[in-house]
């Protein structure tokens, strides 16, 4: 009792004559905070605990034990009992009998190892007995002698020892072979009080009496109706595992049976870790306690009998209380095996021992391999001799008697020095992860145990605590010096099983192995992988697609399938220092790619070819009818696209085009007779020049079939590849027309071969692409080409709903000075009528008139019909989708949203184009290097404006910047002239005219206005204008050469008499004096005389005198070169 009115746990347990663990368990049940035996609790809590413990005692003594959970009982085989005696009689008889024999018997005889246990004071043990359940079977006095050996001793088998078999030890003659049955618990208390020295517990010895073997054979015949007693554990919900083997049919006892102290809590002998079995004064009792177990020999087999353990009474309805035969280890219905001798494997009753050793795999039910004293890691060092391990298969071979499975002893038994390593604990087995609780009450007993137990070197004594794992899982992983070590359940806590260690160490090793790779090694490995990947794809691409944003040198190298160092070297030779992470603009990318022979296509242009809007809606499905196909003619410039269309239309459009090239999208409808029916085809003629990429993309976007025109004498060219990519992006079928087959050098097969490299394989070569050789000039195979086009379009299900409001795409748009904004529309669904309200992107309009390609006015236009519509409030953007709305209000709301978005996009583009570094600009201005060419661009159609702007972007801008202040389709107005005068810009007109007053204003303000019809000339003049802004270069121009033939000295200077061999020499010109191919002077010619007369120049074939103020070291044979510096127009650096 503390001064504060509290009481400690160990004081309460002492008053109640109970273990600390019992009191702690009771406190936990009552939710009273008590962590250890030294914890303090209040008097009120102590009273509650006392009441609970007293109630448990009374209930345990009066009621049968509760059924415990499966796989957690400690099962002990007992003799079938005829009539239950009283508890006091049974306990008194057993203990008295055990007390007498344990003090006299059992000298160790075989290398059976013993597991020592920790000591306990007699008083504590006595109190524990009271707390243990005591209903025991009734045993008559006549059967007491016979039952004792059967209940108490296990029949364990020891393997055969081939090297050094131990002879049987003669029994002690001073002891009678018979023993009267007494209460084992009382006997333990008496023994512990009388012994002055701890007894040594050797292996269980078989009794010599005949009755022992007979009773052992009969012991399994336990009636299911007769309950077997079992110790009531402190934790009733933690059943134990069976640890003892079943009895053998015959036991030949050569020694007197040693019952041992089988009280579950054990006495002080067990506490100190010293084996029991012989009194302190008896000779030989402690002579070889760890090397030789006691037992009886039968041949080379040692037969051991375990100590009895009382079992709880179990009901016979399928429980574990009374089962016989081959039971499944750890199963829910376990038979009662015989317990092992010694207190090391004590039950839960007083000590709280939660787990027991599990039987080996392959052993008979209930059989457990004996443990030799030499296997105790912390108490005994192993000896040097070794024997083979026990064969588990031998343990299964045993006779059966009366339905009870009995074990046959193995042939060999290992010596203590070479005990076989036990396998790792079986995961999932019952009891493999149960917690153990310590069997001591204070640190003094633990210290005494350590001092008394010799330890192996470098092996630590592990004390089992409350949170420790099961003994079976832990003892299997310990081995010292190549030998397996079996630890005492009371004293040692082994490490984790080997299997778990290995499995746990593997991930760690893998992690360490990964960490060993340094950054340089990882980079080297990545470089090797990339190099291998590049080597695998050495084939250079035919064309690369560059995104709208800039790409880095490394990305360009990957696209070109070359090393980045090659790109850097190419840029270095062009005066550009770059790294692998530096971004490149489009012009630089095109220049580098051109060196490697790969054309470049912008990704945004390819995206423009993709069909983004579905023209047919769900409401149109019921009203769909067949529509004419839209055919786009594509190909490289001058490959004959327009001539082919002229041959189809029987017209002469190409002759009327400026420069003989197409610069607009021409939309035509042609009626063709097919299968005695007139079929309509809509053709779109796209420009082939490289500047009109966007036009080609728009043409592909609305097409159903792409006709790829390739000249038979020229083959596949860059724009041909671009057209192929557009067609593939739009996912439309391709029909190849191999044109100009009538020209010399035409090779259609070579064209097919080149196209097959682009995965376009002709049908006659086993592919699926239609290729038709034609001649547009002579009209050869034109009908066959049209027929093939119709066949291809028939495969495509081309339908539209003409009974709805029109939807389509703006093919082209321009500003006409008489008609205003004009848009070429292709109706793709529905019917467009005059007077419809049309919204084309951010532009709103009302169709005032429609005309076809021949200028014929139309009232309506159905699906796949191209028309020119008038009535827009401004020029729409080519490529936008248009849609007809039922009223102007709904159309205006849609257009307003689009206009705001377009305005924001346009502003962002302008800001991006004008974004420049302030420091770079100021430096260029100071050096005079900043040159700008301001332009105002007016063209006939929107597509031409786009083409010109795209071409201007590709011009070099390192020294001269081109700024387009205004670009729009339409005629040149007076407003444009005023803007050009204010900004010093040049007005560029493309296929357009000047409005009234614009010419006069341009002359008044000295504004340069240029008008062009061919895009080639326009781009050439703009480049010349940019070069004109550059400072001219000074270059040397050689004018003559003279030879020194005489030297005249005049005062301090000297004059060279020369003969003009080439050209002429002028006074004050630059001269260079060479002597033996070395320049000795470079300067001005100051004096030139001929016959003492000063002259301006001397021509070839005459003699003259030459003097230089800064040079007088003339020698005969010198060569004088005369030259002058002239300015030369600079070229743009490309």
UniProtKB/Swiss-Prot annotation:
**Which residues belong to any copy of the tr-type G domain?**
626-798
According to the record, the residues making up region (G2) are 660-664
Compositional bias ranges of the Basic and acidic residues kind: 391-403, 438-450
Extract the ranges annotated as region (Disordered): 55-465, 491-524
Biased amino acid composition, Polar residues: 56-65, 83-105, 137-147, 208-234, 251-264
In this chain, the stretch annotated as G5 covers 775-777
Give the UniProt keywords, A-Z. Answer: Cytoplasm, GTP-binding, Initiation factor, Nucleotide-binding, Protein biosynthesis
Note the InterPro entries from the entry: EF-G-like_DII (IPR053905), IF2_II (IPR044145), IF2_N (IPR006847), P-loop_NTPase (IPR027417), Small_GTP-bd (IPR005225), T_Tr_GTP-bd_dom (IPR000795), TF_IF2_bacterial-like (IPR000178), TIF_IF2 (IPR015760)
Where is the region G1? 635-642
Q: Under which name does UniProt file this protein?
A: Translation initiation factor IF-2
**Protein source organism:** Prochlorococcus marinus (strain SARG / CCMP1375 / SS120)
Gene from which the chain derives = infB
């Amino acid at each position: 009792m503390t001064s504060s009115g509290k009481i400690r746990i160990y004081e309460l347990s002492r008053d109640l004559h109970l273990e600390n663990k019992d009191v702690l368990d009771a406190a936990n049940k009552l939710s009273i905070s008590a962590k250890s035996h030294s914890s303090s609790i209040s008097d009120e809590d102590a009273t509650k605990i006392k009441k609970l413990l007293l109630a448990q005692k009374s209930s345990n003594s009066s009621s049968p034990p509760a059924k415990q959970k499966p796989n957690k009982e400690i099962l002990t085989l007992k003799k079938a009992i005829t009539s239950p005696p009283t508890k006091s009689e049974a306990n008194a008889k057993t203990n008295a009998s055990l007390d007498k024999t344990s003090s006299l018997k059992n000298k160790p005889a075989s290398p059976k190892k013993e597991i020592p246990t920790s000591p306990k004071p007699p008083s504590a043990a006595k109190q524990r007995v009271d707390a243990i359940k005591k209903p025991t079977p009734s045993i008559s006095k006549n059967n007491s002698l016979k039952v004792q050996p059967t209940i108490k001793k296990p029949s364990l088998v020891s393997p055969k020892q081939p090297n050094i078999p131990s002879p049987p030890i003669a029994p002690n003659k001073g002891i009678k072979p018979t023993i009267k049955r007494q209460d084992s618990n009382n006997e333990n208390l008496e023994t512990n009080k009388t012994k002055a020295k701890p007894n040594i517990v050797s292996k269980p010895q078989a009794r010599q009496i005949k009755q022992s073997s007979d009773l052992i054979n009969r012991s399994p015949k336990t009636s299911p109706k007769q309950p077997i007693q079992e110790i009531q554990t402190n934790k009733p919900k933690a059943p134990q595992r069976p640890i003892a083997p079943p009895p053998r049919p015959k036991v030949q006892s050569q020694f007197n049976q040693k019952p041992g102290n089988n009280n579950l809590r054990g006495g002080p002998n067990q506490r100190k870790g010293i084996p029991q079995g012989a009194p302190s004064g008896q000779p030989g009792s402690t002579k070889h306690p760890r090397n030789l177990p006691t037992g009886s020999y039968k041949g080379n087999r040692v037969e051991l009998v375990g100590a009895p353990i009382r079992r709880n009474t179990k009901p016979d309805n399928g429980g574990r209380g009374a089962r016989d035969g081959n039971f499944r280890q750890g199963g829910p219905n376990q038979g009662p095996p015989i317990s092992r001798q010694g207190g090391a494997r004590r039950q839960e009753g007083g000590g709280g021992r939660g787990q027991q050793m599990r039987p080996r795999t392959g052993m008979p039910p209930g059989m457990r391999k004996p443990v030799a004293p030499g296997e105790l890691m912390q108490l005994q060092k192993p000896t040097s001799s070794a024997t083979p391990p026990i064969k588990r298969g031998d343990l299964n071979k045993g006779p059966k008697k009366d339905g009870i499975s009995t074990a046959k002893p193995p042939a060999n038994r290992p010596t203590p020095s070479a005990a076989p390593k036990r396998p790792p604990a079986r995961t999932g087995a019952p009891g493999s992860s149960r917690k153990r609780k310590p069997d001591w009450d204070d640190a003094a007993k633990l210290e005494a145990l350590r001092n008394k137990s010799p330890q192996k070197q470098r092996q630590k004594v592990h004390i089992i605590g409350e949170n420790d794992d099961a003994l079976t899982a832990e003892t299997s992983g310990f081995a010292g010096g190549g030998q397996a070590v079996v630890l005492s359940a009371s004293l040692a806590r082994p490490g984790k099983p080997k299997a778990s260690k290995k499995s746990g160490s593997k991930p760690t090793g893998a992690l360490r192995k990964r960490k060993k790779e340094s950054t340089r090694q990882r980079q080297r490995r990545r470089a090797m992988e990339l190099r291998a990947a590049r080597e695998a794809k050495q084939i250079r691409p035919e064309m690369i697609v560059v995104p709208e944003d800039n790409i880095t040198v490394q990305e360009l190298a990957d696209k070109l399938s070359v090393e980045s160092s090659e790109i850097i070297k190419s840029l270095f030779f062009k005066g550009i220092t770059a790294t692998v992470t530096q971004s490149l603009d489009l012009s630089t990318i095109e220049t580098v790619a051109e060196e490697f022979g790969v054309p470049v296509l912008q990704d945004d242009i390819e995206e423009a070819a993709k069909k983004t809007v579905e023209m047919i809606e769900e409401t149109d499905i019921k009203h769909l009818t067949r529509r004419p196909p839209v055919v786009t003619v594509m190909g490289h410039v001058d490959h004959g696209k327009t001539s082919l269309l002229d041959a189809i239309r029987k017209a002469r459009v190409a002759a009327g085009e400026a420069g003989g090239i197409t610069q607009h999208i021409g939309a035509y409808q042609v009626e063709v007779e097919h299968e005695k029916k007139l079929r309509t085809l809509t053709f779109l003629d796209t420009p082939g020049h490289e500047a009109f990429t966007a036009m080609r993309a728009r043409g592909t976007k609305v097409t159903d079939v792409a006709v790829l025109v390739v000249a038979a004498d020229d083959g596949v060219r860059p724009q041909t590849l671009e057209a192929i990519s557009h067609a593939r992006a739009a996912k439309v079928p391709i029909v190849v027309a191999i044109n100009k087959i009538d020209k010399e050098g035409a090779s259609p097969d070579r064209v097919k071969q080149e196209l097959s490299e682009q995965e376009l394989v002709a049908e006659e070569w086993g592919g699926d692409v239609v290729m038709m050789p034609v001649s547009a000039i002579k009209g050869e195979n034109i009908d066959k080409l049209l027929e093939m086009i119709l066949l291809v379009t028939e495969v495509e299900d081309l339908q539209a709903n003409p009974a709805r409001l029109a939807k389509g795409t703006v093919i082209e748009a321009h500003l006409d000075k008489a008609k205003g904004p004009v848009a070429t529309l292709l109706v793709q669904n529905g019917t467009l009528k005059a007077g419809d309200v049309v919204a084309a992107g951010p532009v709103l309009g009302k169709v005032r008139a429609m005309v076809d390609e021949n200028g014929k006015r139309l009232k309506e236009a159905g699906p796949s019909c191209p028309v020119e519509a008038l009535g827009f409030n401004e020029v729409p953007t080519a490529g936008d989708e248009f849609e007809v709305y039922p009223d102007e209000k709904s159309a205006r709301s849609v257009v307003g949203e689009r206009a705001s978005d377009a305005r924001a996009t346009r502003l962002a583009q302008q800001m991006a184009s004008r974004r420049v570094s302030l420091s770079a600009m100021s430096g260029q201005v100071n050096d005079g290097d900043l040159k700008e060419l301001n332009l105002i661009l007016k063209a006939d159609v929107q597509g031409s404006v786009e083409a010109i702007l795209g071409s201007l972007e590709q011009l070099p801008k390192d020294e001269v910047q081109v700024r387009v202040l205004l670009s729009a389709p339409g005629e040149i107005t007076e407003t444009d002239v005023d803007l050009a005068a204010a900004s010093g810009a040049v007005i560029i007109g493309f296929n357009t005219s000047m409005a009234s007053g614009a010419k006069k204003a341009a002359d008044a303000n000295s504004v340069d206005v240029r008008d062009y019809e061919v895009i080639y000339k326009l781009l050439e003049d703009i480049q010349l204008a940019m070069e004109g802004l550059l400072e001219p270069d000074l270059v040397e121009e050689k004018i003559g050469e003279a030879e020194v033939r005489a030297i005249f000295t005049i005062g301090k200077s000297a004059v060279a008499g020369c003969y003009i061999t080439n050209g002429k020499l002028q006074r004050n010109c630059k001269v260079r004096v060479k002597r033996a191919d070395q320049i000795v002077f470079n300067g001005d010619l100051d004096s030139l005389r001929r016959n003492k007369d000063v002259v301006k120049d001397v021509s070839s074939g005459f003699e003259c005198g030459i003097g230089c103020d800064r040079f007088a070291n003339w020698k005969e044979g010198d060569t004088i070169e005369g030259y002058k510096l002239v300015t030369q127009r600079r070229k743009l650096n490309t």
